[in-house]
Amino acid sequence: MLDIDKIPADQPVLIAGPTASGKSELALRIAEHSGGVIVNADASQVYDCWRVVTARPSAEDESRAAHALYGHLSYDTLYSAGHWLRDVTPLLKGTKRPIIVGGTGLYFLTLTEGMADIPATPPEVRAEADTLSLETLAADLDPETRARIDMQNRARVQRAWEVLRATGRPLAEWQDDTPPPLLPAKDCTALVVEAERDWLETRIRRRFSMMIAQGALEEARAMQDRYDPALPSCKAIGVPELMAHLSGALTLEQAEERASVATRQYAKRQRTWFRARMKSWQRVSPQA
């Protein structure tokens, strides 16, 4: 059981966890108890167009504590872990203790273990990668890189392929040359929310129905004329499914079910990743 009274008020807090696990609620409790600014570490929550679909903090939540890096980007902005690290850096030096929370493990990894200085991907290399299947991209990667990334996440696999294609060096080699981290985990209260699978899956099944009731369909309808499935912002779970419903390809019930399945699959990958890459972090229950 986590005793938030024992968390040093002047020490940064990191909270990682799978989707729908209650990590944002925990961050808000800590902020209200001992102060701080809640900083987003979830790649889908950086876009201004998706508050409901991506479960960004509500306006009420934002009124209870300071929040940063939520919904601060236009839907068509390309945003990487490197961009996030740049944006979070000044918050580490601010007057309020950062409480960094999210489900994008790569963000936490770059923060606590450092980030390789990899050259930007040339547009022609990215254009070539966009035409290739996930299987084709994966087949070109070296074993060490394959072992380090989520091989079911196209964005991660494509990024690794682009690095190899553009530089001639595997992503794993670049990572091995990484400079010191901005914020080592040992200097933080580093927490991973570990939710029991059945409990989490029940929450996930309820969650999308709640999103529909809260306006997720209206959110998707407002973006329908700008929807581009190639954009990272439009790949957030729930967005393709709702767009398919709006186009007549799926019933709303089918869209809800597909989104729930995709969310459960994503949560499973997140749990696996956190277990493998955050072994030294303190485990806490959602009810902590």
Curated annotation (Swiss-Prot):
The record marks 104, 126 as: Interaction with substrate tRNA. One of its GO terms (molecular function) is ATP binding. Its EC number is 2.5.1.75. GO terms for biological process: tRNA modification. Substrate binds at residues 19-24. The keyword Magnesium applies. Its cofactor is Mg(2+). The keyword Magnesium applies. ATP binds at residues 17-24. It is an enzyme of class 2 (transferase). Keywords: ATP-binding, Magnesium, Nucleotide-binding, Transferase, tRNA processing. Catalyzes the transfer of a dimethylallyl group onto the adenine at position 37 in tRNAs that read codons beginning with uridine, leading to the formation of N6-(dimethylallyl)adenosine (i(6)A). Belongs to the IPP transferase family. HAMAP family: IPP_trans (MF_00185). NCBIfam families: miaA. This is tRNA dimethylallyltransferase.
